[in-house]
C-alpha cells in the first residue's frame, strides 16, 4: 500500500509518500520539499526518507521511532537532489543526482570512525513515443562505493522501460494503461 499526498504553490511543492506491507511490518515514510527554478530550470529538492527497522544502535537498543533524530541512531536519511531536463525538444533527457547528507547513511572510515557516507544515486530518463505509446527509458546508477546501496564501486542498479497508453472510451473518459 503506497499512498501519496502532494501540494504545490507556484514552483514550490511538498510531497508525502508512504509505503507499508499488508503482511509484514516494513514501513517507509518520505517527505520532500522541492523548488523548480523557472519553466525550464533545474529542480532542487530536500527529503527525509525513513524506513522502520533501520536504526539498531551498537548496544542493541532499538531507537527507531519516527520522531527520533539523534545522529547515528535515527532511521531518517536526509537527502538533497538536483534534477534537470535538457532544453532540447528532440532530446528531452532528464538527469537527476541525489545525495544523502545526514542521518542514518553512515559508514566506518579507514580510521575506524563512524562518519556520514554521502551515498548518491544518479538517474537518467528519456521519454519518447512509438505508434501512440508513450515510453520512458530509465538508467539509474550508484557512482561510487557506498554501504547504503550495497555496492563496492560504480554500479548500474536500475534499468527500466515504462510504456503507457490511454484507452479512450468517449470524449470525456479515458483509462491510462
Predicted regions, residues:
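Residues that define the transmembrane beta-barrel architecture of outer-membrane proteins
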Residues: 1, 25-29, 74-80, 114-122, ...
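Short glycine/proline- and aromatic-enriched beta-strand/turn motifs that initiate or cap beta-hairpins
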Residues: 1-22
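Residues on the lipid-exposed face of transmembrane beta-strands in outer-membrane beta-barrel proteins
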Residues: 3-9, 31-35, 80-86, 95-97, ...
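Short loop/turn motifs that connect adjacent beta-strands in outer-membrane beta-barrel proteins
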Residues: 11, 38-45, 85-93, 126-136, ...
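Mid-chain, structured segments of secreted extracytoplasmic proteins
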Residues: 20-49
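Outer-membrane beta-barrel translocator/channel fold
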Residues: 46-81, 86, 96-108, 137-152, ...
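A contiguous pocket-lining binding segment that forms or flanks enzyme active sites
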Residues: 107-133
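Predominantly the C-terminal beta-signal and adjacent terminal strand-loop region
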Residues: 141, 150-177
Amino acid at each position: 500500500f503506497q499512498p501519496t499526498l502532494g501540494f504545490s504553490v507556484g514552483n514550490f511543492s511538498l510531497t508525502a509518500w508512504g509505503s507499508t506491507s499488508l503482511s509484514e511490518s516494513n514501513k517507509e515514510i518520505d517527505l520532500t520539499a522541492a523548488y523548480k527554478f523557472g519553466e525550464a530550470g533545474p529542480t532542487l529538492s530536500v527529503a527525509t526518507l525513513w524506513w522502520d527497522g533501520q536504526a539498531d544502535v551498537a548496544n542493541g537498543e532499538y531507537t527507531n521511532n519516527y520522531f527520533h533524530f539523534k545522529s547515528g541512531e535515527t532511521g531518517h536519511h536526509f537527502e538533497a537532489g538536483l534534477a534537470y531536463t535538457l532544453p532540447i525538444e528532440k532530446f528531452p533527457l532528464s538527469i537527476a543526482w541525489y545525495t544523502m547528507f545526514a542521518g542514518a547513511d553512515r559508514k566506518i572510515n579507514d580510521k575506524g570512525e563512524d562518519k556520514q557516507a554521502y551515498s548518491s544515486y544518479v538517474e537518467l530518463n528519456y521519454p519518447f513515443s512509438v505508434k501512440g505509446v508513450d515510453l520512458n527509458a530509465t538508467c539509474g546508477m550508484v557512482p561510487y562505493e557506498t554501504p547504503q546501496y550495497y555496492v563496492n564501486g560504480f554500479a548500474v542498479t536500475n534499468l527500466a522501460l515504462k510504456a503507457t497508453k490511454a484507452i479512450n472510451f468517449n470524449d470525456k473518459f479515458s483509462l491510462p494503461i
